[in-house]
Amino acid sequence: MGGAVSAGEDNDDLIDNLKEAQYIRTERVEQAFRAIDRGDYYLEGYRDNAYKDLAWKHGNIHLSAPCIYSEVMEALKLQPGLSFLNLGSGTGYLSTMVGLILGPFGINHGIELHSDVVEYAKEKLESFIKNSDSFDKFEFCEPAFVVGNCLQIASDSHQYDRIYCGAGVQKDHENYMKILLKVGGILVMPIEDQLTQIMRTGQNTWESKNILAVSFAPLVQPSKNDNGKPDSVGLPPCAVRNLQDLARIYIRRTLRNFINDEMQAKGIPQRAPPKRKRKRVKQRINTYVFVGNQLIPQPLDSEEDEKMEEDKEEEEKEPGEALKPEEPPQNLLREKIMKLPLPESLKAYLTYFREK
C-alpha cells in the first residue's frame, strides 16, 4: 500500500519527497524537519518503518504520518519568540521541531495523557540535546512536558500564540480549545474529520480554514474524582531565563555568527549541497483513514501504479561523480568554545555538557 509520498531511504530522503509533493513548502519548516531524525523517535526494531509516510503506534507511543506533521507545521506559521502549546504531545517529535523555530525566547509546552509517554519524550529530548549533530546549528526552545488530560487544563492558565491538538476534537469542545488561544494566534486541530486552521482575529471573532481530510482517534474524556468533578491540570510556568542562561545563549550566538562570517569570507557554503536522488512520479493524496493502528492515505496505489513508479526511478549522477567515504561532521561551534580562555566547567556548560 502506498503513502501520500514515496518512502525514503533516510530522513533527508523522506524530506525531499515531502517537498516534491508540496507538503513542506517553506525553508524554515524544511530545516526543522531535516534537523530532527524521525527514526530517532522509533523503538529499536521498528526504525525501518520510520521513513515511510505512515503513522506508527506501539502501546501508548504514537507518531502521525510525516505528511500530517508537515501540514501542521506549515499551518502553524511559526516565528521565533512565540508561545506554543501541544495538546497530546506524545513522543515530543513535533515539539522538538517547533523548538528549533521558536528559538531561546519562545515558550514550548506540551501536555500528554500517558505518564510513560512523557518519560519517553523526555528521554528523546535529552538524547537530542546531548547527541544530535543538529543541536549546535540552532537556537533552541526546549519543550516542557506535563502529564494530564488536555480537557482538564486549569481555567486560569495562560494563553498561547500557537496551539496544536493531535487528537480528534468534538464540536462541543471547540470553544474550550479556542479560549486557550491569544488574539492573533493560530490553532490547528482535527475537527469533524478535517484538519482545521483557526485564527483568532479578535476577542470574539475567528477565521477557519480546512487543510486536509483526516480521521483521528478522539480525545479521551476526563475521569472524575470523588467529588464528581475532574481534577484540573496545571501547565508549565512561563519562566524567565536567568542571567547565566542568557549569557550562554549570547556567547553561543556570537560565536555562531563569527563562524558564519568566517565561512562567508572564505567562500565556503554554509549548507551542504542537496543530495542527488531518484526521480519519482507520485500524486498528492488528501484523504486519510485509520486501518488498525495505521493512518493510511486513500486512495491506495494499485500494483500497476507501483510498478510504473519503480520503472520511472532513475539515479541522477553528476558527470564524473565518484563515491567518497563520508567524513565525520565538523562541529565548529564546539571547537570555538573549547578554545575560549575559560575553566573547563564553564566550557562544559556552554556546550550543554555535550561530548561531541
Swiss-Prot record:
It is found in: Cytoplasm; Membrane. The gene is PCMTD1. It is a lipid-anchor. Residues 301-318 have a biased composition (Acidic residues). Belongs to the methyltransferase superfamily. L-isoaspartyl/D-aspartyl protein methyltransferase family. It comes from the Eukaryota. GO terms for molecular function: protein-L-isoaspartate (D-aspartate) O-methyltransferase activity; ubiquitin-like ligase-substrate adaptor activity. Residues 340-343 are annotated as: CUL-box. Residues 85-94, 160-164, 181-191 are annotated as: AdoMet binding motif. The lineage of its organism: Eukaryota, Metazoa, Chordata, Craniata, Vertebrata. The active site is at residue 64. This is Protein-L-isoaspartate O-methyltransferase domain-containing protein 1. It comes from Bos taurus (Bovine). SUPFAM superfamilies: S-adenosyl-L-methionine-dependent methyltransferases (SSF53335). A lipid is attached at residue 2 (N-myristoyl glycine). The keyword Cytoplasm applies. Component of the probable ECS(PCMTD1) E3 ubiquitin-protein ligase complex, at least composed of CUL5, ELOB, ELOC, RBX2 and PCMTD1. Interacts (via the BC-box) with ELOB and ELOC; the interaction is direct and stabilizes PCMTD1. Disulfide bonds: none annotated. PANTHER family: PROTEIN-L-ISOASPARTATE O-METHYLTRANSFERASE (PTHR11579), PROTEIN-L-ISOASPARTATE O-METHYLTRANSFERASE DOMAIN-CONTAINING PROTEIN 1 (PTHR11579:SF4). Residues 319-331 have a biased composition (Basic and acidic residues).
